From Swiss-Prot:
<comment type="function">
    <text>Located on the platform of the 30S subunit, it bridges several disparate RNA helices of the 16S rRNA. Forms part of the Shine-Dalgarno cleft in the 70S ribosome.</text>
</comment>
<protein>
    <recommendedName>
        <fullName>Small ribosomal subunit protein uS11</fullName>
    </recommendedName>
</protein>
<keyword id="KW-0689">Ribosomal protein</keyword>
<keyword id="KW-0694">RNA-binding</keyword>
<keyword id="KW-0699">rRNA-binding</keyword>
<dbReference type="GO" id="GO:0006412">
    <property type="term" value="P:translation"/>
</dbReference>
<dbReference type="GO" id="GO:0003735">
    <property type="term" value="F:structural constituent of ribosome"/>
</dbReference>
<dbReference type="GO" id="GO:0019843">
    <property type="term" value="F:rRNA binding"/>
</dbReference>
<comment type="similarity">
    <text>Belongs to the universal ribosomal protein uS11 family.</text>
</comment>
<dbReference type="Pfam" id="PF00411">
    <property type="entry name" value="Ribosomal_S11"/>
</dbReference>
<dbReference type="InterPro" id="IPR018102">
    <property type="entry name" value="Ribosomal_uS11_CS"/>
</dbReference>
<keyword id="KW-0687">Ribonucleoprotein</keyword>
<dbReference type="InterPro" id="IPR036967">
    <property type="entry name" value="Ribosomal_uS11_sf"/>
</dbReference>
<dbReference type="GO" id="GO:1990904">
    <property type="term" value="C:ribonucleoprotein complex"/>
</dbReference>
<dbReference type="InterPro" id="IPR001971">
    <property type="entry name" value="Ribosomal_uS11"/>
</dbReference>
<comment type="subunit">
    <text>Part of the 30S ribosomal subunit. Interacts with proteins S7 and S18. Binds to IF-3.</text>
</comment>
<dbReference type="InterPro" id="IPR019981">
    <property type="entry name" value="Ribosomal_uS11_bac-type"/>
</dbReference>
């Protein structure tokens, strides 16, 4: 066997960010939390489904809380202290995700609802008859 030359690997330098933004996308089926820097570059993210919840348990407030804690702990490696929170969607995990980020130790400076609202755009889906 010929010896394969080893590639030199450099340790990735983690940038230090003091202020960040938390984007919470709470749909009826799942909750996605992304923590970014001021420019919008993702530092960490977590989902209810990726946190071990499957099926209808993904859409619970507790699953959103666990996902927010995972994203928050991962973003602390970058030195984030203050968060501006943007919440999108009507899901059940909206409020519990914000509370979980607060419990991790972040100072939440601002909470903004950025749920897209149509100005009479597309026709909505028909109502379910069960």
């Amino acid at each position: 066997m010929a010896k394969v030359p080893s590639r030199s690997t450099r340790k990735r330098v983690r940038k230090q960010v003091a202020d960040g933004m938390a984007h919470i996308h709470a749909s009826f089926n799942n909750t996605i939390i992304t923590i970014t820097d001021r420019q919008g570059n993702a530092l960490s993210w977590a989902t209810s489904g990726g946190s071990g919840f499957r099926g209808s348990r993904k859409s619970t407030p507790f699953a959103a809380q666990v996902a927010a804690e995972r994203a928050g702990v991962a973003a602390q490696d970058y030195g984030v202290k203050n968060l501006e929170v943007f919440v999108k969607g009507p899901g059940p995990g909206r409020e519990s995700a914000i509370r979980a980020l607060n419990a991790v130790g972040y100072k939440i400076t601002n909470i903004t609802d950025v749920t897209p609202i149509p100005h009479n755009g597309c026709r909505p889906p028909k109502k379910r008859r069960v």
